[in-house]
Amino acid sequence: MASVPTHQSEKEKKNDELSTAILKDKVKPNRLIVDQSEQDDNSVIAVSQAKMDELGLFRGDAVILKGKKRKESVAIIVSDESCPNEKVRMNRVVRNNLRIRLGDVVSITPAPNLSYGTRIHVLPIDDTIEGLTGNLFDVFLKPYFLEAYRPLHKGDIFTVQAAMRTVEFKVVETEPAPACIVSPDTMIHYEGDPIKREEEEESMNDIGYDDLGGVRKQLAQIKEMVELPLRHPQLFKAIGIKPPRGILLFGPPGTGKTLIARAVANETGSFFFLINGPEVMSKMSGESESNLRKAFEECEKNQPAILFIDEIDAIAPKREKTNGEVERRIVSQLLTLMDGVKGRSNLVVIAATNRPNSIDGALRRFGRFDREIDIGIPDAVGRLEILRIHTKNMKLADDVDLEQIANECHGFVGADLASLCSEAALQQIREKMELIDLEDDQIDAEVLNSLAVTMENFRFAQGKSSPSALREAVVETPNTTWSDIGGLQNVKRELQELVQYPVEHPEKYLKFGMQPSRGVLFYGPPGCGKTLLAKAIANECQANFISIKGPELLTMWFGESEANVRDVFDKARAAAPCVLFFDELDSIAKARGGGAGGDGGGASDRVINQVLTEMDGMNAKKNVFIIGATNRPDIIDPAVLRPGRLDQLIYIPLPDEASRHQILKASLRKTPLSKDLDLTFLAKNTVGFSGADLTEICQRACKLAIRESIEKEIRIEKERQDRQARGEELMEDDAVDPVPEITRAHFEEAMKFARRSVTDNDIRKYEMFAQTLQQSRGFGNNFKFPGEQRGSDAPSAPVPAQDDDDLYN
């Protein structure tokens, strides 16, 4: 039987690989890794002789180079014996033209039809010719092109060094287009205004797939849906289906929906038409529909095209819920336009929204927006990819650990990480502000070179940034550890088995073919550390932690309380692995049917129904754990406590003596204490005190010490002033601390105010509940399978620990 889950996991693994198969680079002999060139020539690339033979090329052949974002260039190929077989050497100018960096992959194809040019038009970049006198042609262009036969591609930039200057030129036009070889007979035009550097940099910074991080699976889906039909429509024709028409991207704000659409347009070289939802609306009758029609007509003319509708929920809300006639007409118009897109036309409509459920249902059927792709909150790996993208042009100090930052930024989306990087950089500039004078025309080069963003700057930025998508329910990773909690060893073990094992050892559950338990309920007197335990386990396995206070889910509006529950569970799934902590569970999970009269039409009944269905629907693949805490286990609906939901019921009792000692030590770990203060004696004399009561004693002792310290300082200052008034000589002020530490006297005084928050009567109630639970569990104490006696080598059942701190009683 154990082989079944393994087989299943292999199948799932294969499906995962297939889902991202489109992203894998195909291994071809002409795809080579880019390396730094040893000779700085803009027109020459070098490969090994063996690679030239394999590709059927000869020294001096012209080749076409294909880089990223559909950029192409041309060059002359030569052999270099020191070049490894899988690499190609090229200089920085060629790399920039292809939008690639060292280590990227470039493809090389022969260009036998590349002819000599009749004319070319080149223009200089403005900031490289400032203050230049003399003829550009005679000084720069003529010697450069006479030196060798140079191939050029439209859009290329090349640099020419002469007269102690380096000038950059851009190829505006070539005849024949798009590339040619410049020979002595080629006419060179260089008239016209120089090209502005800003415009050139804008085109250099076109967004491509490289600028997208944390959306690997979604990108694979989009490439299947968009690139395949645009580049190879015959694929769909051969298999006999129509290519998809529309894609709906949805997800929280800032995850990169618009960015993905722009990247796809740039990488496919398609015409890109952007419609912002609200801009379509017009007060003139019929004009809104006309705007939509024009957009579709424009795209039909410029195929292949991508029409991107941002914020589609603004123009296509549910018709039955809108009062405005205009919105209904726009939705109808959009439906007919989507249906009117010709079957084989190279037009794909992409729409984006944060609220997919508010869009008209007719738009979401097959044949319109066929695919809905969730652009969710990135995980740690995705966050690291995004951070690397945003910091690739930043100057980072050696101590910056991007991996650590990525692990700590739970719930951050791409926009939040971009903001984090810019805040860290600004903090670095603030630190250097004393060296910068705003009145100066230029900043000293030494100051500019000393700028480097440090880990300390990132730490500061992390303190100021919070995840935008989860601001309503802050997802945090707590910093509480097991050492902060005194005693409760068995409870800790049980929690580790519940939360840590499924996260850290998922293969064990696969091996035995069983789903891990998903929920636990802590019950016990108030102030015994139920919340603290939940935080510690979330921190221990690096899970997110969403704390939900029961009463905040209930609202006066019909149906909204249930929607709040749904949202909370959706957020937990997005931020998995996640511990969902329901504090005061009894406020939302009371036994149903009791309060029909006065709770707003049974709002709490509906909320508990929603919680139950969400618990049953917890996706097995998502590591979401539910921990509930309550002081009133007797009034909780029994359906919540059945196995499969909150099946582990753990009693958190009042701390025993050893635990009280631990709690006192944890509370006072940062406090200076006098040597004669005996915490063991204090723990012995606080029987029946909860953790919160003990913490209050410590706080009161600290308060008394602070009061005494301030009073003594005031008295010393008064005596000093009196002596000064009498004209006496003042002694040297040694600034002695009047109260250096907390003493026994402070604790003796604090104990006069100490009180027990849990009465004996309360404890009896909890113990009775625990006893009833224990009796209902003992059903199978004497159960044994029939058959032969067990041999000595048979595995024996684990003997339950007979601790006084038993979990369940």
Swiss-Prot record:
Kindly list the positions annotated as binding ATP 1.
P253, G254, T255, G256, K257, T258, L259, N354, H390
Give the tissue specificity: Expressed in germ cells and spermatheca. Expressed in body wall muscles.
Location of the protein in the cell? Cytoplasm, Perinuclear region; Cytoplasm
**Annotated phenotype, changing K530A:** Loss of ATP binding and impaired rotation between the two ATP-binding regions in the hexamer. Complete loss of catalytic activity. Complete loss of catalytic activity without affecting oligomerization
Which BP terms from GO are recorded?
autophagosome maturation; embryo development ending in birth or egg hatching; ERAD pathway; mitotic spindle disassembly; positive regulation of mitotic cell cycle, embryonic; positive regulation of proteasomal ubiquitin-dependent protein catabolic process; proteasome-mediated ubiquitin-dependent protein catabolic process; regulation of protein localization to chromatin
Alphabetically sorted, this entry's keywords are: ATP-binding, Chaperone, Cytoplasm, Hydrolase, Nucleotide-binding, Repeat
Q: Which GO terms describe its molecular function?
A: ATP binding; ATP hydrolysis activity; identical protein binding; polyubiquitin modification-dependent protein binding; protein-containing complex binding
Residue ranges for the region (Disordered) are 1-21, 779-809
Record-stated family: Belongs to the AAA ATPase family. CDC48 subfamily.
Q: Any idea what job this protein has?
A: ATP-dependent chaperone which probably uses the energy provided by ATP hydrolysis to generate mechanical force to unfold substrate proteins, disassemble protein complexes, and disaggregate protein aggregates. Can also prevent aggregation of unfolded proteins also in an ATP-independent manner. Targets polyubiquitinated proteins for proteasomal degradation by binding to 'Lys-48'-linked polyubiquitin chains. Involved in the cytoplasmic elimination of misfolded proteins exported from the ER.
Protein name per Swiss-Prot or TrEMBL: Transitional endoplasmic reticulum ATPase homolog 1
